[in-house]
Amino acid sequence: MAVLQVLHIPDERLRKVAKPVEEVNAEIQRIVDDMFETMYAEEGIGLAATQVDIHQRIIVIDVSENRDERLVLINPELLEKSGETGIEEGCLSIPEQRALVPRAEKVKIRALDRDGKSFELEADGLLAICIQHEMDHLVGKLFIDYLSPLKQQRIRQKVEKLDRLNARA
């Protein structure tokens, strides 16, 4: 397994729309494993393949406290959503920045697991929010897209400054 490089804004590759996975095979399983390793190394709770410059419809999530409840979503489809909620969200591609984002309270999705088996899942709370956040990545959407242009600009400037400082270190 390997830790992959996470893209940061304003990298335009984050805006690419991911293509469906045609076959869940050993290569896709390796990507899933590398994505989990990357997500845990970065202390995230979710990661979309587009964030690591792999433009396929793959998401990994683990919102558990013990980091032992892995969820793999390959080619996820949103079937239903209901209610309204929102929390301050963060993103590995937008380091050290958070903002309140409106989301559905509950979602029902269909996806393939790591072995290519189809399943449906109903989620609420943090898991539902995380699923929506990561599914946005697959269509090139970031949480800052829900914010005003001024807030977007401020966050971009902060991330660019942080990346410059980290490049010097």
From Swiss-Prot:
Its cofactor is Fe(2+). One of its GO terms (biological process) is translation. It comes from the Bacteria. Its EC number is 3.5.1.88. InterPro entries: Peptide_deformylase (IPR023635), Peptide_deformylase_sf (IPR036821). Binds 1 Fe(2+) ion. It is an enzyme of class 3 (hydrolase). Fe cation binds at residues 91, 133, 137. Keywords: Hydrolase, Iron, Metal-binding, Protein biosynthesis. The active site is at 134. One of its GO terms (molecular function) is metal ion binding. It catalyses: N-terminal N-formyl-L-methionyl-[peptide] + H2O = N-terminal L-methionyl-[peptide] + formate. HAMAP family: Pep_deformylase. Removes the formyl group from the N-terminal Met of newly synthesized proteins. Requires at least a dipeptide for an efficient rate of reaction. N-terminal L-methionine is a prerequisite for activity but the enzyme has broad specificity at other positions. Belongs to the polypeptide deformylase family. This is Peptide deformylase. It comes from Citrobacter koseri (strain ATCC BAA-895 / CDC 4225-83 / SGSC4696). The lineage of its organism: Bacteria, Pseudomonadati, Pseudomonadota, Gammaproteobacteria, Enterobacterales. The gene is def.
